[in-house]
């Protein structure tokens, strides 16, 4: 299991073994094929489509004004994805599409998320085949004292952009820290 405590400052808690990578590759091949066939039942279900079309419509201007990001923003017609538009880590080397719809309703948000699953499988497949051997953790001191200053970092997560703004006074604990979770913005709509 890869839980939240798997990721560490400087790397990850442990390396992925070849058995896991092989099983993941097999699972992804099956999942990619099943997504289209299984979702066809839901996508073509007249009742589902009728109940989600034109429901909870969010236009692009309102989404931008309210700070909406991620699939909710892309379902409103704004094709912004931090991984593509302000690339970080290995994303510049990966090929993926940014699913976007213009309707802004619940159906559009659902369809964007389904396409995001397909793109995630595509990204994972590329990374699995290109993952280099070597250490999975940087050699860092147990206690890190950053220089005094400010820093902001952001990543594209499944619900939108997650950001952390930190102010350091040079000690081992942040002087100030603000964590931005996209769900907080989305709950206000």
What kind of region is each of these model predictions?
Residues 1-189:
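Active-site bordering "gate/hinge" segments
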